[in-house]
């Protein structure tokens, strides 16, 4: 089972990907984690990625696809895997399909977690976390007992600098521009499924599992 999980920033992709990974026994593959692991391991493609990052260049699609190819060759991917946040562009989707086609493989399903922009802005801008223990909080959904103080360890709660409304709206605009062609691409292949990400997290997971079987 080879799954692509899509959704805008703050839609809860990472959380749902972890739960799916645990339930189905397939690894969650995020490009950031794979990139860091490849650089740390000093693999050929990892060294190319490191050189690009150190020179201030973008890590190319070719390098990212090389990292995904190496990672999906590992034994824990034999029964499948879940790609979290990749591909992000049509070129990446086409590159991924071409890479898999060389192995006589293909993506089985693409799930898009749909969330409306303004509720998502409220969801993201309300987030904070403890500087000391990392516990997460939210102004509306999980407020701390005392403002800006962690319930667990009494550490100070901080917000990410990029979790302000203007930055979030810009990130969402970029996401929609990049991924709109992807929706059509995967829909035309009959691979696209959609889940309402505005629901309670347990219900979102239930709907995801209903698709995955």
Curated annotation (Swiss-Prot):
Gene name of this polypeptide: adk
GO biological process entries: AMP salvage
Protein's pathway: Purine metabolism; AMP biosynthesis via salvage pathway; AMP from ADP: step 1/1
NCBIfam families in alphabetical order: adk (TIGR01351), PRK00279.1-2 (NF001380), PRK00279.1-3 (NF001381), PRK14527.1 (NF011100), PRK14532.1 (NF011105)
Name of the protein in question: Adenylate kinase
Compartment list: Cytoplasm
HAMAP family named in the record: Adenylate_kinase_Adk
PROSITE patterns for this protein: ADENYLATE_KINASE
Native organism: Magnetococcus marinus (strain ATCC BAA-1437 / JCM 17883 / MC-1)
Species classification: Bacteria, Pseudomonadati, Pseudomonadota, Alphaproteobacteria, Magnetococcales
């Amino acid at each position: 089972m080879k799954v692509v999980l899509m959704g805008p920033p703050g839609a809860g992709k990472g959380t749902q990907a972890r739960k799916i990974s645990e339930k189905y026994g397939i690894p969650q593959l995020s490009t950031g984690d794979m990139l860091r692991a490849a650089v740390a391991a000093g693999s050929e493609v990892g060294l190319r990625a490191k050189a690009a990052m150190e020179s201030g260049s973008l890590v190319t699609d070719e390098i990212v696809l090389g990292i995904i190819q190496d990672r999906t060759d590992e034994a824990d991917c034999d029964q499948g895997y879940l790609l979290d946040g990749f591909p992000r562009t049509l070129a990446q989707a086409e590159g991924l399909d071409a890479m898999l086609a060389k192995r006589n493989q293909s993506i089985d399903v693409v799930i898009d977690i749909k969330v409306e922009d303004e509720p998502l802005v409220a969801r993201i801008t309300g987030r904070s976390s403890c500087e000391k223990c990392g516990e997460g909080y939210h102004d509306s959904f999980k407020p701390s007992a005392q403002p800006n103080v962690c319930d667990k360890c009494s550490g100070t709660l901080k917000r990410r600098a990029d979790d302000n409304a203007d930055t979030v709206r810009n990130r969402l605009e970029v996401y929609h521009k990049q991924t709109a062609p992807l929706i059509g691409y995967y829909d035309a292949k009959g691979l696209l499924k959609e889940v309402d990400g505005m629901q309670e997290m347990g219900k979102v997971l239930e709907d995801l599992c209903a698709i995955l079987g």
